[in-house]
Each structure stands twice: as C-alpha cells, then as structure tokens.
C-alpha cells in the first residue's frame, strides 16, 4: 500500500485528526500512477538530490525517496510535521524542514545534503495560490537547479510554456523561458485530489539552459520592458511603452529611435515579440537612455 492510496490517505488524515487549511492551498494527490509518472518525467535516480515543496502527507516524497540520493522537503504547515514523521519513518534519506520556502536560506540548507555536489532537481506539487512567486524565487536564487518538474494549475503551466502570438504568452513566459526551457509533460485531472480543486492541473518540465536564452545588457531592465509591454494586452507596444516611460516629446523621440533600431513597428503588440526581439528592444531603449 502507498501513502497516496485513497484508503491510506483517508486513514492517515483521520488518525491524526488533520483538517485542510485553505490558506495553504492544500490538495493531496491520491493517484499512484500519476506519482510514478511524475518521478519518471523527472528522471530521478541515486545520483540526484531533490528539493520538494509542500510534501503534504508524503505521497510524492515516498516515490522520490525510493529513487533519489536524498530528498529535502519544505513544509510550511507545522501540523503536518508529526504526520510526515509517521508516514516517512522508513526513509533515512529524507529531511523535512518546517519552513516557508520563500523565507528560508536555501543555499545553507543545500549544504546539509550528504553530497551537496550532486545535481539538484525540484520536484513538487506547488500550492496554486503561490506558484509563480515560488518558481521565480527558485529560478532567480542563484542556486543551479538543473531541472524542475512541478505540478501547478494548468492555466499557469500554459502561460509559462506559451510561445509568441498565442493568448497565453506574456511576461511570465519570458521571465521563465529566459532561464529555462518549459514544456507541459501531461495533464492531471482535478478528480485525483483530496479535496478536489476547482481546476485541472499540469505537470510542467523545465530544464535550465546552460546560458540565458538571449544576451541582454541589463537583465532587470529587460524584464521591466517585457512586463511593461503586456500591461494592456490589447494595446500596441507604443501605447504600453509610452504608458510606462512617459508621453513627453523627448520620450516619444527616444522610443521612436529605439523601435526603429530594434526593427519593430510601433503598432505591433507585445504578444508578437520573441525573446530575441524583446532583448533587442530592451538594449535599444537602454541605449537611448530610457
């Protein structure tokens, strides 16, 4: 029997008198086939350390621990600590940390792996309400995670993996794809969770690029420009950029020159631009002193 078997999950929750907290976005997966598929997608073996976020009662942790060198799981809900101590008692390669992943000194914790030099993968069922902040926090942490295989709301996975000229494409697509390749591996129906969420989920596989997707002079400025370009999706690049930089004649003159230098029409929309085009635009705007 597995932790994720519905009867086991139910018994564990009842035994510990656990009640779900909406504020933590708790939805526990009760499908062992999907858990197996997640671990297979992540290609976990004994030469990999794993960071897990939000282990719940340990359903995914169990599958990870059977194959990984070590698993370090971060759980914000202190009420789950005794449950995890119970369900994962047979594994000596699992460490559960009762901390908020957004506030913890992750680099320090990683040094506690027996072999901290092994590749590190992030495998997790992320809380829906805080998926994007967690992902960006980890991606921008400076820690060289080689891969992420994470479950999230399908809509968010679609946005992250979206390509130009699609409805889902936006500043989040650019922010993630600058650092990583991103592809939806498979869909997870809402019916396999306790309690069932209101939407379907997706497993997103993201692999870190050896170098960022495009070269830019100023990364922060590049992200600001891309974000500004999507402020109002139905507006043109010109309207969004003047909304961000200002509408004085001097600014308009600089914008005109930068767009011309980048080879872009003022009437194009942000959703039509590739990462390379955003890079060219950001560098041109920077060159104009904006």
Swiss-Prot record:
S-adenosyl-L-methionine binds at residues 27, 29, 54, 75, 100, 125. It comes from the Bacteria. Keywords: Cytoplasm, Methyltransferase, RNA-binding, rRNA processing, S-adenosyl-L-methionine, Transferase. Its EC number is 2.1.1.182. Its main location: cytoplasm. InterPro entries: KsgA/Erm (IPR001737), rRNA_Ade_diMease-like_C (IPR023165), rRNA_Ade_Mease_Trfase_CS (IPR020596), rRNA_Ade_methylase_Trfase_N (IPR020598), rRNA_adenine_dimethylase (IPR011530), SAM-dependent_MTases_sf (IPR029063). It is found in: Cytoplasm. NCBIfam families: ksgA. Belongs to the class I-like SAM-binding methyltransferase superfamily. rRNA adenine N(6)-methyltransferase family. RsmA subfamily. This is Ribosomal RNA small subunit methyltransferase A. It comes from Streptococcus pneumoniae (strain JJA).
């Amino acid at each position: 029997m597995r932790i994720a078997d519905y009867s086991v999950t139910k018994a564990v929750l009842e035994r510990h008198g656990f009640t779900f907290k909406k504020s933590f976005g708790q939805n526990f997966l009760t499908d062992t086939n999907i858990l197996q598929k997640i671990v297979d997608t992540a290609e976990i073996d004994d030469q990999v350390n794993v960071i897990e976020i939000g282990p719940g009662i340990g359903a995914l942790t169990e599958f990870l621990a059977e194959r990984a060198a070590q698993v370090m799981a971060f759980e914000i809900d202190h009420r789950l600590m005794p449950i995890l101590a119970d369900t994962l008692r047979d594994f000596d390669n699992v460490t559960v940390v009762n901390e908020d992943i957004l506030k913890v000194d992750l680099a320090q914790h990683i040094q506690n792996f027996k072999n901290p030099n092994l590749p590190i993968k992030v495998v997790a069922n992320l809380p829906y309400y805080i998926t994007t902040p967690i992902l960006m926090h980890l991606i921008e942490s400076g820690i060289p995670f080689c891969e992420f295989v994470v479950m999230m709301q399908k809509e968010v996975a679609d946005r992250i993996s979206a390509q130009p000229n699609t409805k889902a494409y936006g500043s989040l697509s650019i922010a993630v794809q600058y650092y990583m390749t991103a592809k939806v591996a498979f869909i997870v129906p809402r019916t396999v969770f306790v309690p069932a969420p209101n939407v379907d989920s997706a497993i997103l596989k993201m692999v870190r690029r050896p170098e960022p997707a495009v070269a830019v002079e100023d990364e922060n400025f590049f992200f600001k420009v891309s974000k500004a370009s999507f402020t109002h999706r139905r507006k043109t690049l010109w309207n969004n950029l003047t909304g961000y930089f200002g509408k004085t004649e001097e600014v308009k003159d600089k914008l005109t020159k930068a767009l011309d230098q980048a080879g872009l029409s003022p009437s194009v929309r942000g959703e039509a631009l590739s990462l390379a085009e955003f890079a060219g635009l950001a560098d041109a705007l920077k060159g104009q002193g904006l």
